Amino acid sequence: MNKFRTFPQINTLIEDESLKSYPFYIKAFFCKKVVAKLKENFFQDEISKDKLLLEIKKEIKTFYRKDLQSVINASGVVIHTNLGRSVIHEELYEACKDIICNYSNVEFDLENGKRGSRYALVLEKLKMLFECEDALVVNNNAAAVFLVLNSLCYDKEVISSRGELVEIGGSFRVPEVIKAAGVKLCEVGTSNKTHLKDYEQAINENTALILKTHKSNFALMGFHSEVNIKDLHELAKEKELLSYYDLGSGWCENLNEKLIKNEPKIRKLVQECDILSFSGDKLFGSVQAGIILGKKELIEKLKQNQLLRMLRVDKLTLSFLNESLKAYLQKDYEKIITLKLLNDDLSFIEKKALRVQKELKFQTQLKKSKSLVGGGSMPDKSLDTYILTFQGDALKLQTRFRKENIIGRIENDEFVLDFRTIRENELQKLILTINQMENL
């Protein structure tokens, strides 16, 4: 006798009354999945329909749990890559809503009734804000690096310091991107010291560009030196080459004074190289995008590359980026949430923590601590903050809070909530959620 005959038919499971409330495609998928999984591990004479249905409902609930959800970032990492990096202000979202939910003039000129430029309005604002000749936007900074190198240096050679051949999250490695772009890499210097003469001695007839990459996600300390972009640009100009700064994470305006030391400002850097690029959702505090600034003739070459079609941004990205740029131009920095969280003073953070502590039914301790910038930015810098610590097994508490979409951290064997990254409009929700939890 075929032992699998004891399994109920898939259709019988799908049509069961207990699964009636679930959409057909979802319950059909999980009915097939659970039956297949149990058949692989089938050592019993029979299996009940009730057990199958229990497993199916469990899988469906897990599926819904895995959907994209909002969380409260109590980790103390402001630009938390795994939590979506920069947060968009509600007012900026409302300003974009009409564009996103309707047809729009994303690529249509309302003046002459003809096809328009997808980037026109955003590029105009970028040129105003950064005082650059021209600009371009692609879907992230990795795409920007690839497009710049492929457009300007294909089948040529690029010089880069060994100390700047970085790897960022997701195993994105600068040398691999250079290779994928059809460009040959010439490494100069050592991991801790690179001099101007190293670049100069490496130049040959096949050299097209000198690349500088900002070490945004790690810091070199002790016996080390590097060449600034201004000097590299002068060398490139003298040798009739191009200079490119892969900035990754740069700041624009109104950043906490404790953070800006030795941290490059975009408007200054754009005057010191031929072309540069950075991420829109890091210190700039907007949406994911690769923003490229530079000489007009170079940006034109990028626009002619067929790859741009594959890397272009959609109306959602353009809408949110446009509103972020307007906020910067109007000096309305409160609407750039990343800046606000980095700039919040300690007394304001303490007030948030005290308000929550006062209303919680569980015992906590208020302590000073340190927050991080995150997002591959400023690894050697931290910001003062206040945390609430909870009594009990730290790992169990971290898991329990995570199930309620509250992401804290473990510090000194204690589970803590960091109030620099908890926004004021989340406090009441945080209080209600914690107070509804049991057996902490």
Swiss-Prot record:
GO terms for molecular function: L-seryl-tRNA(Sec) selenium transferase activity. Pfam families: SelA. One of its GO terms (cellular component) is cytoplasm. Its EC number is 2.9.1.1. It catalyses: L-seryl-tRNA(Sec) + selenophosphate + H(+) = L-selenocysteinyl-tRNA(Sec) + phosphate. It is found in: Cytoplasm. The modification N6-(pyridoxal phosphate)lysine is found at K282. Keywords: Cytoplasm, Protein biosynthesis, Pyridoxal phosphate, Selenium, Transferase. Its cofactor is pyridoxal 5'-phosphate. Pathway: Aminoacyl-tRNA biosynthesis; selenocysteinyl-tRNA(Sec) biosynthesis; selenocysteinyl-tRNA(Sec) from L-seryl-tRNA(Sec) (bacterial route): step 1/1. PANTHER family: L-SERYL-TRNA(SEC) SELENIUM TRANSFERASE (PTHR32328:SF0). This is L-seryl-tRNA(Sec) selenium transferase.
